[in-house]
């Protein structure tokens, strides 16, 4: 990806946030990385400066809690179980799209 506006992180984040119920995304160690010193090896999640560095891309997503099912209407007991499959598919689409984009 383009390391400024169309970085790999921003394109993945944009696509992941399109999934209903997603509230956050972090790459690599996420906010735990702020606790490391400069000499420690950070786990950056396979992305450096917005471009894939060849390591596996890893991220964590936060999903909002399931709404109460006490009311009337249609409810999912837990839609969070479907999120990993959808997130994997969305990630594959973003990576495939980037692989077809001319450099």
Where are these regions (language model features)?
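Internal helix-turn-beta structural module
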Residues: 57-103
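Glycine-rich anion/phosphate-binding loop at the beta-strand->alpha-helix junction
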Residues: 1-71
